[in-house]
């Protein structure tokens, strides 16, 4: 299993639009990627966002990046981000 934590820099005032777009993407990931076990948007008390992801294997992670819904989602996030995401990849222990 492969874990991914994506820290997202959302533009001020764009939080509601971002959440709508990200939740739509998350629904597509869960519906269309059998190798994905978790794709969840989280927000802390300060308004910082992360997406927590869990994939069965390398093939599932690669399929996510190549999926049509993931590629198409870029247009949904245009103008909503304050900067690039920080992606941290981790191995699942146990």
Where are these regions (language model features)?
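Short phosphate-engaging motifs
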Residues: 14, 47, 69
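N-terminal first-folded block
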Residues: 2-32, 37
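Structural signal for conserved beta-strand scaffold positions within catalytic alpha/beta enzyme cores
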Residues: 43, 88-89
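Short hydrophobic/aromatic patches at helix-to-coil boundaries
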Residues: 90-94
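Short, well-ordered beta-strand segments in beta-rich or mixed alpha/beta enzyme
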Residues: 2-9, 38-65
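An amphipathic, aromatic/His-enriched active-site/gating alpha helix that lines ligand/cofactor pockets
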Residues: 24-38, 54-88
């Amino acid at each position: 299993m492969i874990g991914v934590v994506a820290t997202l820099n959302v533009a001020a005032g764009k939080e509601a639009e971002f959440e709508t777009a990200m939740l739509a993407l998350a629904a597509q990931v869960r519906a269309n990627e059998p190798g994905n076990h978790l794709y969840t948007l989280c927000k802390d008390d300060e308004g910082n966002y992360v997406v927590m992801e869990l994939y069965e294997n390398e093939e599932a992670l690669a399929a996510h990046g190549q999926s049509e819904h993931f590629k198409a989602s870029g247009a949904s996030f245009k103008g909503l981000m304050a900067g690039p995401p920080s992606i941290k990849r981790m191995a699942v222990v146990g």
